[in-house]
Amino acid sequence: PAEVPADLQLPAGFREPRICLPGVLAVCGPQAAAAGGEADETMERFCQIGCVSEALNHFPLVVVVDDSDFTARTLNNFLWVVFTRSDPAADVYGVDSFTQQKHWGCRGSLVIDARIKPHHAPPLSEDPQVTQRVDALAARGGPLAKYL
């Protein structure tokens, strides 16, 4: 789907569904609380609701994020959020998931938990003074100018 279905129902605490790409849905979820590597009950509940939500399962990929507007705004944002905030060994879920002959699968949407987790490092923020000093080094006539 290229737009959010009118009949899409989300569990309590999940909101603001946004289309990232055709077939890819970003949904804001509640703040992540599970420790690194542990299953998150919130995500399990999301997938259980997905078992009965036909509208959700029209999306092959659903990502649960902290800010769905930011995630869906550009492809770069989507790639950054999903692949820096998820661990394939711990943050991949599926609607109506199963294991058959040691192979995991799901009959509904593949769901990736790409929220900021308690064990993640805090976000980097620019220091204006450091930025100013680096800009001066790269300015015309500066020691780094010939490389830029």
Question: What does each of the following model-derived ranges do?
Answer:
Residues 1-148:
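Charged, compositionally biased interaction regions
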